[in-house]
Amino acid sequence: LTWDCVDFSPKSIADGTASIMIEKELQRVDKTAMKSLEQKDVLFIFPQSSKRNTSMLVLKKPKTESSVRKIFIPATVAHQLESWKREQERTKEALGGEYTDYNLVLANGLGHPMERTRIAALLNALIEKNDLPKVVFHSLRHSSITYKLQLTGGDIKSVQGDSGHAQAQMV
């Protein structure tokens, strides 16, 4: 997720249309598989930290058209994102040239992409610190789908669009 895909303008928060546009994904791709990826789908290749790496991180278009979607977010989430953006700006200013700005919402302290394993580790630490039941990160998506089905009275089509599932049976 990049900041240009997040709308948390004061107007969008006030009128309830704050949103995140899902149109990019971070993926670790094997160097040999990179050749078979359609180059038009690759938006950015992140510099490698080591020449010995057998894979590379890329920002690319999602694999299916149904994966591209707009997700509306509540004002509380929009305000959290605003706060996080300000924190990133302060870090960037303090580090100067040491910070590489890739415009990423989830970036480490130097601006580099945060991969799934790091996000999962942070979630696990948060769970442990707060004595919460253990969950896997992906289960949050399923919980969200269940909650949205309840909110919409079982409207599978609208939940399908929100979740990015290509077929209603997948919801």
Task: Label each residue range with its predicted role.
Residues 5-16, 134, 153-171:
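Short, polar N-cap/turn motifs at the start of nucleic acid-interacting alpha helices
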Residues 88-101:
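Short helix/loop segment immediately N-terminal to the Walker
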Residues 72, 76, 114-121:
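A generic alpha-helix signature
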Residues 59-68, 107-115, 131-139, 150:
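Short, contiguous acidic/charged loop-to-helix segments that flank catalytic cores in large enzymes
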Residues 118-129, 139-167:
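C-terminal catalytic core of tyrosine-transesterase DNA break-rejoin enzymes
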Residues 2-90:
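Conserved tyrosine-mediated DNA breakage-rejoining catalytic core shared by Y-recombinases
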